[in-house]
Amino acid sequence: MGGAAAIFRDGHGLNEPPLLRVNLKDDVIRDDSKASQLNSLDKGGGAGLLHTDSAEKNGTGAASGSPSEIDSFALSPLSQPADKDPSVGTPFMRQWAAAKRENPNALLFFRMGDFYELFYDDAAVASRELQLTLTARDKERNVPMCGVPYHAVEQYLTRLLRRGFRIALCDQMEDPKLTKKLVRREVTRVLTPGTALDAGLGQDENNFLAALFELGESHASHKDKSAARVGHSETVCAVALLDVSTGEFRTAEFRGGNARAQAVDELLMAAPSEVLQAASAEWPSDLQAQLERIPARSRVEDWVWTREFAVPLVERQLNVRSLEGFGLAGHEAAAIAAGAVLHYVRTTQKNEALHIDSLKFEQHSAALELDQVTVRNLELVEPLFAGQDDRVTLFRTLDACLTPMGKRLLRATILRPLNDAAKIEARYEAVAEAHGDLLKREEIRRAFGGILDLERLLARISLDSAGPRDVRAMAASLARLPGLKTAVDAMTAGLWREIAARLDVLDDVTARIARTLVAEPPLTLADGGVIAPGIDAELDELRTISTSGRQAIAAIEDRERQRTGIGSLKVRYNSVFGYYIEITKANLALAPADYERKQTLVNAERFTTPELKEYERKILSAHDRSIEIEKRIFGELRKFVLESASRIRRSSAAVAEADLLACFAHLAAGRRYTRPKLADEPVLEAVAARHPVIEQWMEETREGRFIANDVYLNAGDEGPSLLLVTGPNMGGKSTYLRQAAMLVLMAQMGSFVPAESLRLGLVDRIYTRIGASDNVARGRSTFMVEMTETATILNTATRRSLILLDEMGRGTATFDGLSLAWATVEYLHAETGARTLFATHYHELTMLEEKLKKVRNLRVGVKEAAGGIVFLHNIEVGAASKSYGIEVARLAGLPAAVIERAKHVLRQHERQERTAAADAQPGLAADPVQLTIFTPLSQRIVDRIEATDVNALTPLQALNLLEELQQELKEKG
């Protein structure tokens, strides 16, 4: 199926394997591409792309099942019966087959006039996914086909990309009217989920293409893998993330025994649309299973993942001689991952992607760390359950940004809050100034009006996907920058001054675009009339010819009517015959002898004349030449804009930061948020704190007022470091825990917070152990998920961390769960020392307050009434006296008979299991021991006391009984 192997040589003398490989399950398919295309991109670097398809195939070779089951799409265009093989069909179908061979793993959209057509299996899949009518091109050979109009193709491409398909666009490279041969066609772009540029992308979300790489997993310089590991005794993994649609490009590196898990976690946090891995990469099955959550997973040849190939490619892209200035000195894996992503983009887009001109190496210590579990549990950017209202997320609650760039920065800031006190304080100062001056704040926010997505407009221009209206939209957006700069210049805080200095108004770019393009250009260049008058003298002359030519045609019509005496004579035009004179059959006898017959109709005859032919030539050639000139001028304009790409990106980043700060100030003013105070000690002290999401939800739905509560944690010498929160379900324990995390997140984002006051020592990482719904659905037990997440916390948390543990131990037997919860509290108290909130239904744990110095009991407020209980939703000092579980069940609507029976059973168990406090001590045992709260000995003593008739005992008998029980405890306790 593949073409002959082609070997190319890049600028570094590296022999490269064939250009394209498709891995269909375990079958490897090879194919080639054109050296001329790749030489202009990566100096001869081959594509090196593989795609793994995990879907089952049906009998025709088409992928069955939903696209969510498909890693990345792969079809064989030649999987037809021999008598229907397109390679032996018409020249057109042979042309199609050649293009399909170059892109066997993509749906081939083949341009035919005003339509993109698909054939064979591609047509069957597109028909099913897009609800298109499936027809046949050749009735005898039964070639399935379907198509979509070229002017509406974007919406169809978007639907396919969102479902994980890969698409190749094969366009006409010459005007069909100018050739009598088969129109030349080439694949101009390959679209993948990770390289999508369509307008359907969410304006507040990135569309990341990711690379996941472990140093040594590929063939370094085509030698044995072991050679690549020399000097790397520890595991080194890297993740690179590139949003082609905005130019955002970053990479990170992880080292040590947990590097693989950290890399996968970083990857999933970014929620990429597509992930790249080396062809030979073998990751642990549990981590590889997590990667299945990514819509598309693609394999790239090993030679791409080498220092010799990847690093020089990144240097060329960034136009530097070394990557040290980007913080990548000593971080080879991160640089290689970045190079693999770049190579994939340049190859699929057949473009150098000039808008990608910067790379950020992310230092983990620079941000408050969050893992995917915490992001999911706290519902920071996505609801916990599919289909749930996204207003339950922190992102939607805080999103008062007015530009797409600001919205994306807000999302990124939520996922990576700051961990640098100076940077946080700088944001506080800027927010405080805008918060305190309504007029200046609103002036800044008004200036954002009309600023479109500068980053994505620039990307479309860079990748040659922009139409005239996109470039005009760029100019309209840039025209708003002077007003924004004036508004920001009025501010005095340091960060506002920095933004003003970075904000280039780009008036030269705005003026050039406005001068070159008409005010309201057509959708495409092919429509003509894009370039403004006065830009090109030849273009203006050709337009005059075209206009005057049409006037001349009208004059010819009038003259010929007078000459022939035929009042109904018409001069008309169509694309087949050009200009012609039409005379009805009744007037044919009046036709002059110099008329040349062109066409006979039922009721008329059509003629031409030498004069009409000459005018036709002038008019049509003028139009075609005009389009050529307009394309040239538009290309020059595009090049000019791209020369300012770095300036546009810097200004776009400045707009985003200004939008974010103005958003924080707007929220603070409207929602009574206050400025946090940063402390050197590891403290979390909040007065009258509220949960930002729930508070806003209650206000919008008018469901009452949120009850504020205090929080005090101190991992230093004073105050409690661990709060044990008890009380009934539905009482507010989980809300209280999450509320503490939200305060920390917002404070370290640089935002004001929903509290009367907050004093905070910076947190290095937030851990949560709350739910397990996602992993349970993937076959892992609730208890296993819980223990795995708890192990991560105990093994990696530091004194500066914030830990939230909600109902630990509920997934196993009562005594096992209690024992593990007890031991975990002891460990967190004695070893970790982190600020911890521990919500529990094990009331026995409240005894630890007496044993452990920095443990404090809190309970949710409950009011008992004749009709049951009322949740007060306030947090009180002390332990809950009981769980009220049966009362909660009654409120949930369980039948009265069940409630009464439950009360009876509860009383029985309380009598049977009433016992003394556990003997366990807070100190850690030298050897592992099973913590036993209730022992058979204790139960026997309780049973003996309950069976004794105290009223029948004499004082002496009572003393003797007490002595016996005491002696038994000493001997067997």
Question: What is each residue range found by the language model?
Answer:
Residues 120-123, 222, 234, 331, ...:
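ATPase nucleotide-binding head domains, primarily ABC-like/P-loop NTPase cores
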Residues 467, 480, 533-534, 558-568, ...:
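Charged, surface-exposed helical/loop "interaction arms" that form contiguous linear patches used
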Residues 929-940, 948:
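C-terminal low-complexity, glycine/proline- and small-hydrophobic-enriched intrinsically disordered tails
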Residues 574, 933, 949-973:
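Terminal-proximal interaction/regulatory segments of ATP-powered molecular machines
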Residues 2-61, 65-433, 446-462, 466-558, ...:
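Charged catalytic and DNA/RNA-contacting regions of genome-maintenance
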Residues 170, 193-201, 352, 492-495, ...:
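Active-site phosphate-binding and catalytic loops of NTP-dependent enzymes
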Residues 107-110, 114, 554, 561-585:
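Extended, charged helical/alpha-beta scaffold domains that provide interaction surfaces
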Residues 601, 605-639:
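Extended, charged coiled-coil "arm/hinge" scaffolds of SMC/Rad50-like chromosome-maintenance ATPases
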